[in-house]
């Protein structure tokens, strides 16, 4: 069959056989894959499924009564979403073969698959190809099913036809447990969705290309079909009963020949392939099964043969030389396994198998090393005696062979050419063998292909040809052409083998006869129902024999579709394997089903003996024809030699013509009969036109030993007159012939000498050739040495380059390390510096902590002292209580005088306030700057009679006077000592420059305060209502003190002001730092420390104020203190502090008195006027605008807070007990923000320095404020506050008196 025709029929054989159905053994036609007409509008499966809505309501038309019996409430889901039932699964899992067998045995259906449940017909599907003709099987990723044979493959409706299509004929493997099915995820459908337009039967080639084009590790390996390689695995759960496919990976690379030209003879010998491609078996195997899967790369020629890229054949194979292999019938296979062989035939098999396994991996070279190795690799089953005879005859039987032929030559005086002729014939045969040998794959000689040992070896060269080459598809032929020298040696060895074979034939005949008798005796002795008839063997596609299996197992596998019609099977009693289709044809039924068993098959041994005899006869005929042709050539040469001596007569001319005619006839017969056997054919198979069919003819003489040219035997077809002429000519020249014989003998001797000379010359030539070979070998060694030297030089050069590169890398690394080291050093230095700073900070913290501890200790001592003083004060208070009655009359008089003084002071204070308002650029009437919160105090007081008020005040003033006398001297002394101690402690660091001038005594300060208090009382009494609440009288006194002394603009609760003022001004024993500046923020210092002694100090201090009330009555000093404390209160407001800080930063030209400007701005109500004043004094800058914006925001917040406090004031007064005002909590410490020693130092400084005093700003945190001086009127304050000489008239308050 031509190559072009073959490529057209490259599809699977079983599919063509099923489609045609022409042969007897093919099953009936199964439904072919129909070609549906494509619809005009096609929708994908997902598109159709997307149209299905589970929630669709039933149409109203169907709700009629007539439809109710057939109406279903819930819509049926699409079949793609419904899992298969068991029956459907079984139907879709059946293969073509099984369905065909069921129909053959009468158990199957007609033309469709058994069962179409739920009314589904073959037309129901998702478009093309979804009918009952689909026979499914699972991929690698589907789970071993529930059926006993592993046939429970989950076929899901969610799989499309394309996803299932090319896996229809696949069968599950032996151990595929625990793989996820399609719906559980996994790469099942990777690379599987091919939208085929044609049916699957036409698409095998396109699909193969698409498969191979995909990801090598992905789709086709994971979801590809497993096809034949797994179909032949035995299904026993614990592994194969004989050598399984997993054990021999080499077999996977054998080429599966497509049996061309032999379809009529071997229709069932083809191996069924899943998609028709010759490499399906290899592709269907997992990668881990193949040793060098990644190395086996190649291509396909036009005939579909796989060509490896490792050694591509150097020349194309002629079409007439392509091999058509047929496995030798395994007639003796079971006899080996049953022990009919002797022990000597078994042991070499094992050793040969091991040797063959080793040599098979080595490849082509291993098969060419020795004849022993190649023979054992090619035919491991050959008996060892035969091999040893061949191996020994290679060496020692060459010379006896030559001597025998020389004897035959001497008889005919033709000895000189025959020895050269016989080896030349062998060389021709070997040359013919070499061409097909190069086409045989290297794995053809795998020792795992067990062949029948007793088959006689016609020629060791032909052994590989007989092996059944049914390996895994996809493993192409590997060229085994040896090198030139090895090829010459190989030719010589093969010629020697052929010569040695002729002598071994007799021994083989005897052995064959004895074995034939044994087998026939054995076959006769087997009973008809013997167990051997129930045991079956089969040969899998890898060439292995699997079994034995009983009828039930074989029947199950056959029904499941594992066996093709070309499967070689036999019973244990049969002598050879037969195709399953032939057995079914002969038996008329499936051989595995129960029924009468035919007698054992014994025909192969007779065929083998006949073949053997035909081979021997053909060899003898070939030798005889060669010899006869040689003799005719010699006679013709003699006649030509005689023609030179004398002119030929007519008889001689006729004789010469007859000789020429005979020579031409013999040559024609030799050329007609194909002398050279076609080594590409199997020896056991008859082939038309081959030498093995040559029959001996009666017309050819078997022996000719004529002594001369004229003794040449003539054909019976020679005419009679020519024979008579020859006889007469012989009689006439008998004497002449005797002389010619002597001459011939002399000539033979000369020829013998010539032959010896030629032999010597040949030996010399061989010696020369050997020397040349030796020189060539030396030259090669020198070249190899030079190449090695060159490689060594290159290696040294590379090493030098590597060393230089490493050196450069080392230098770069050192530079990087140096840079890193420098960075590390800098980092360490930075760390050291940070550590030193941290150490200094810790030292500073330690010093501050030590100072705090000192202050705490001092405070505790002071508390103890105050406790003792309070005890003494209590005793004195008791003493004074006794004297109180004596002073009662005197106090009443003093009270009248104080009322007059208060009225006078109130009048002067009102005048002064009017002047201040005019001096401050006519501030708005809503401002509270410098005003007393009289209205608040008045509103908060209940109405009491004037007599009750006076009585309460007289009693309280008397108590204050008595207490003041006792504490005056002690307080004075303790205060001076404390100031001296703290000044000494803080002299080292953190102190501020001490104010100069003499200090006023505490008594003077207390007297001034008492006068202020009396004056304020008189003012309050004039403005109060006649009736006041009794519980608010006591607090009113303290409120008036705070307002008159401090000039507070804050309208907090009066009781609260009393407790805060008295404790913060006069409780000097709780001082912290007497040198602290006037504006220092000490909010946190005023907290819980003074809460312990506040209540104790209030009573005694109130008495001292009452005592000093009578002693000093100067109104000027009261006004000075009033003015002073008004400034202090303003400065200590948090909002005022922020304004001063911002203005100090913005006042770069030093042309602004900050406290005055702040107090002025706070009284300006209109935001526009605020912006105008700030722009006029600070300039039109972005900082000034930002300050104005924040100033307005903060002022609004402060006013909101003040209003909220005023609203809460009545509630707090109702909740407070009436007679305990000193114990109320502090709420205005944040506004005052001053510690006790600060106020005391301010009193001392301002009273002692009448001309000049600096209000010093002390650092808050670590930042010092700029010292600012308050410009005041000396007529009001009693002392001068002139600015420094560098600042002329800065900070001076202008009043109406200046104009």
From Swiss-Prot:
Listed result of changing residue 273 to C: In PARK11; uncertain significance
GO molecular function terms noted in the UniProt entry: cadherin binding; molecular adaptor activity; proline-rich region binding; RNA binding
Bias-annotated ranges (Polar residues): 369-392, 924-936, 1026-1048
Residues covered by region (Required for interaction with SARS-CoV-2 non-structural protein 2 (nsp2)): 860-919
Family that this chain belongs to: Belongs to the GIGYF family.
Acidic residues bias spans: 289-298
Function: Key component of the 4EHP-GYF2 complex, a multiprotein complex that acts as a repressor of translation initiation. In the 4EHP-GYF2 complex, acts as a factor that bridges EIF4E2 to ZFP36/TTP, linking translation repression with mRNA decay. Also recruits and bridges the association of the 4EHP complex with the decapping effector protein DDX6, which is required for the ZFP36/TTP-mediated down-regulation of AU-rich mRNA. May act cooperatively with GRB10 to regulate tyrosine kinase receptor signaling, including IGF1 and insulin receptors. (Microbial infection) Upon SARS coronavirus-2/SARS-CoV-2 infection, the interaction with non-structural protein 2 (nsp2) enhances GIGYF2 binding to EIF4E2 and increases repression of translation initiation of genes involved in antiviral innate immune response such as IFNB1.
Residue positions, PTM N-acetylalanine: 2
Illness: Parkinson disease 11: A complex neurodegenerative disorder characterized by bradykinesia, resting tremor, muscular rigidity and postural instability, as well as by a clinically significant response to treatment with levodopa. The pathology involves the loss of dopaminergic neurons in the substantia nigra and the presence of Lewy bodies (intraneuronal accumulations of aggregated proteins), in surviving neurons in various areas of the brain.
Residue ranges, annotated region (Disordered): 112-131, 147-195, 214-247, 266-433, 733-793, 845-866, 872-891, 917-936, 957-997, 1009-1048, 1084-1112, 1195-1230, 1247-1271
Amino acid composition bias (Basic and acidic residues), ranges on this chain: 151-182, 225-247, 312-329, 338-363, 393-414, 957-972
Name used for this protein in its record: GRB10-interacting GYF protein 2
Effect of residue 457 to T: Probable risk factor for PARK11
Gene: GIGYF2
Location in chain, cross-link Glycyl lysine isopeptide (Lys-Gly) (interchain with G-Cter in SUMO2): 1123
Secreted as UniProt keyword: no
UniProt short sequence motif 4EHP-binding motif, positions renumbered to this chain: 40-50
Pfam families (alphabetical): GYF
GO BP: adult locomotory behavior; feeding behavior; homeostasis of number of cells within a tissue; insulin-like growth factor receptor signaling pathway; mitotic G1 DNA damage checkpoint signaling; mRNA destabilization; multicellular organism growth; musculoskeletal movement
Keyword tags: Acetylation, Disease variant, Isopeptide bond, Methylation, Neurodegeneration, Parkinson disease, Parkinsonism, Phosphoprotein, Ubl conjugation
Motif placement: DDX6 binding motif: 280-310
């Amino acid at each position: 069959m031509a190559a072009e025709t073959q490529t057209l029929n490259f599809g699977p054989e079983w599919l063509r056989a099923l489609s045609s159905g022409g042969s007897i053994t093919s099953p009936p036609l199964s439904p072919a894959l129909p070609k549906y007409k494509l619809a005009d509008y096609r929708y994908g499966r997902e598109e159709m499924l997307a149209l299905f809505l589970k929630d669709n309501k039933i149409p109203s038309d169907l709700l009629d009564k007539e439809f109710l019996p057939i109406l279903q409430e819930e819509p049926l889901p699409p079949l793609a979403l419904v899992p298969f039932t068991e029956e459907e699964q079984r139907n879709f899992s059946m293969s073509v073969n099984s369905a065909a067998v069921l129909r053959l045995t009468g158990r199957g259906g007609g033309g469709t698959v058994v069962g179409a449940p739920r009314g589904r017909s073959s037309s129901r599907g998702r478009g093309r190809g979804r009918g009952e003709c689909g026979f499914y099987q699972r991929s690698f990723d589907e789970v071993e099913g529930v059926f006993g044979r592993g046939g429970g493959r989950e076929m899901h409706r969610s799989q499309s036809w394309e996803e299932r299509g090319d896996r229809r004929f696949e069968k599950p493997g032996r151990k595929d447990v625990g793989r996820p099915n399609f719906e559980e995820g996994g790469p099942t459908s990777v690379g599987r969705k091919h939208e085929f337009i044609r049916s699957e039967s036409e698409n095998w080639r396109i699909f193969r290309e698409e498969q191979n084009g995909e990801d090598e590790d992905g789709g086709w390996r994971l979801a590809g079909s497993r096809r034949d390689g797994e179909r032949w695995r035995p299904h026993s759960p614990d592994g194969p009963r004989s050598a399984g496919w997993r054990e021999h990976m080499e077999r996977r690379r054998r080429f599966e020949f497509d049996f061309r030209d032999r379809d009529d003879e071997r229709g069932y010998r083809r191996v069924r392939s899943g998609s028709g491609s010759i490499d399906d078996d290899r592709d269907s195997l997992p990668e881990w099964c193949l040793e060098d899967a990644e190395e086996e790369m190649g291509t396909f020629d036009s005939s579909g043969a796989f060509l490896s890229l490792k050694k591509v054949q150097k020349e194309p194979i002629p079409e007439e030389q392509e091999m058509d292999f047929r496995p030798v019938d395994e007639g003796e296979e079971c006899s080996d396994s049953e022990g009919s062989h002797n022990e000597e035939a078994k042991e070499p098999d094992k050793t040969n198998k091991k040797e063959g396994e080793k040599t098979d991996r080595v490849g082509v070279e291993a098969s060419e090393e020795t004849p022993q190795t190649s023979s054992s690799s090619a035919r491991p089953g050959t008996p060892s005696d035969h091999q040893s005879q061949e191996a020994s005859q290679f060496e020692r039987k060459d010379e006896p062979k030559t001597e025998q032929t020389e004897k035959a030559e001497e008889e005919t005086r033709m000895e000189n050419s025959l020895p050269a002729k016989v080896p030349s014939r062998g060389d021709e045969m070997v040359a013919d063998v070499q061409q097909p040998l190069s086409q045989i794959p290297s794995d053809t000689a795998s020792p795992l292909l067990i062949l029948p040992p007793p088959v006689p070896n016609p020629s060791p060269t032909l052994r590989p040809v007989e092996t059944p080459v049914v390996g895994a598809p996809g493993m192409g032929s590997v060229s085994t052409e040896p090198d030139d020298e090895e090829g010459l040696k190989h030719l010589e060895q093969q010629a020697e083998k052929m010569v040695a074979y002729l002598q071994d034939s007799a021994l083989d005949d005897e052995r064959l006869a004895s074995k034939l008798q044994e087998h026939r005796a054995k076959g006769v002795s087997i009973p008809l129902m013997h167990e051997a008839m129930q045991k079956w063997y089969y040969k899998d596609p890898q060439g292995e024999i699997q079994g034995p299996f009983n009828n039930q197992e074989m029947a199950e596998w056959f029904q499941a579709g594992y066996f093709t019609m070309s499967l070689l099977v036999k019973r244990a009693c049969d002598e050879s394997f037969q195709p399953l289709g032939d057995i079914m044809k002969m038996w008329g039924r499936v051989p595995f089903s129960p029924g009468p068993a035919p007698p054992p098959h014994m025909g192969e041994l007779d065929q083998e003996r006949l073949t053997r005899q035909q081979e021997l006869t053909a060899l003898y005929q070939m030798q005889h024809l060669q010899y006869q042709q040689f003799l005719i050539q010699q006679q013709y040469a003699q006649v030509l030699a005689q023609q030179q001596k004398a002119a030929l007569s007519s008889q001689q001319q006729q004789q010469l013509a007859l000789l020429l005619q005979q020579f031409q006839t013999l040559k024609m017969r030799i050329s007609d009969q194909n002398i050279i056997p076609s080594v590409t054919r199997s020896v056991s198979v008859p082939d038309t036109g081959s030498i093995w069919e040559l029959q001996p003819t009666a017309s050819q003489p078997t022996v000719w030993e004529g002594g001369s040219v004229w003794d040449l035997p003539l054909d019976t077809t020679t005419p009679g007159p020519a024979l008579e002429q020859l006889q007469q000519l012989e009689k006439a020249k008998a004497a002449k012939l005797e002389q010619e014989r002597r001459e011939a003998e002399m000539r033979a001797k000369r020829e013998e000498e010539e032959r010896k000379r030629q032999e010597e010359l040949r030996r010399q030539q061989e010696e020369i050739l050997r020397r040349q070979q030796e020189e060539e070998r030396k030259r090669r060694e020198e070249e190899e040495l030079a190449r090695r030297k060159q490689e060594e030089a290159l290696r040294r050069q590379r090493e030098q380059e590597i060393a230089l590169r490493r050196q450069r890398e080392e230098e770069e690394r050192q530079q990087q390390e140096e840079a890193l080291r420098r960075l590390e050093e800098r980092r360490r230095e930075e760390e050291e510096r940070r550590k030193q700073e941290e150490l200094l900070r810790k030292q500073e913290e330690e010093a501050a902590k030590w100072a705090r501890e000192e202050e705490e200790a001092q405070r505790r001592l002071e508390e103890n002292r105050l406790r003792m003083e309070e005890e003494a004060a209590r005793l004195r208070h008791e003493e004074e209580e006794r004297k109180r009655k004596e002073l009662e009359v005197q106090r009443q008089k003093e009270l009248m005088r104080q009322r007059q003084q208060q009225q006078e002071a109130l009048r002067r204070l009102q005048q002064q306030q009017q002047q201040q308002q005019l001096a401050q650029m006519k501030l708005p009437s809503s401002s509270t700057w410098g005003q007393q919160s009289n209205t608040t105090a008045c509103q908060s007081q209940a109405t009491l009679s004037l007599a009750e008020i006076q009585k309460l005040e007289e009693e309280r003033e008397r108590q204050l006077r008595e207490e003041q006398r006792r504490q005056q001297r002690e307080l004075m002394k303790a205060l001076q000592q404390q100031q001296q101690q703290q000044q000494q402690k803080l002299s080292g660091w953190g102190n501020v420059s001490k104010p100069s001038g003499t200090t006023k005594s505490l008594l003077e300060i207390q007297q001034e305060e008492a006068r202020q208090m009396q004056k304020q009382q008189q003012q309050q009494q004039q403005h109060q209502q006649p009736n006041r609440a009794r519980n608010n009288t006591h607090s009113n006194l303290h409120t008036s003190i705070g307002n008159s002394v401090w000039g507070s603009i804050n309208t907090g609760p009066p009781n609260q002001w009393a407790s805060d003022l008295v404790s913060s001004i006069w409780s000097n024993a709780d001082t912290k730092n007497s040198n602290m500046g006037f504006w220092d923020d000490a909010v946190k210092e005023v907290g819980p420390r003074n809460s312990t002694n506040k209540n104790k100090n209030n009573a005694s201090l109130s008495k001292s104020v009452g005592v000093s009330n009578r002693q000093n009555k100067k109104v000027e000093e009261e006004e000075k203190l009033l003015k002073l404390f008004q400034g202090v209160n303003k400065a200590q407001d948090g909002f005022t502090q922020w304004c001063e800080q911002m203005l100090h930063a913005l006042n770069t030209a030093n042309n602004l008195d900050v406290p005055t400007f702040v107090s002025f701005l706070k009284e300006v109500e209109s935001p526009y006027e605020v912006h105008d004043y700030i722009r006029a004094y600070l300039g039109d800058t972005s900082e000034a605008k930002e300050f104005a914006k924040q100033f307005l925001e903060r002022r609004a917040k402060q006013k909101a807070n003040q209003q909220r406090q005023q609203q809460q004031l009545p509630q707090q007064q109702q909740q407070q007990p009436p007679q305990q005002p000193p114990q109320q909590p502090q709420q205005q410490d944040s506004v005052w923000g001053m510690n006790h020693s600060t106020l005391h130092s301010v009193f001392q400084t301002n009273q002692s320095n009448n001309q000049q005093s600096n209000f010093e700003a002390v650092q808050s945190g670590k930042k010092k404020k700029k010292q600012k001086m308050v410009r005041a009127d000396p007529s009001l304050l009693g002392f001068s506050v002139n600015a420094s000489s560098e600042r002329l008239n800065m900070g001076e308050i202008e009043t109406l008196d200046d104009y």
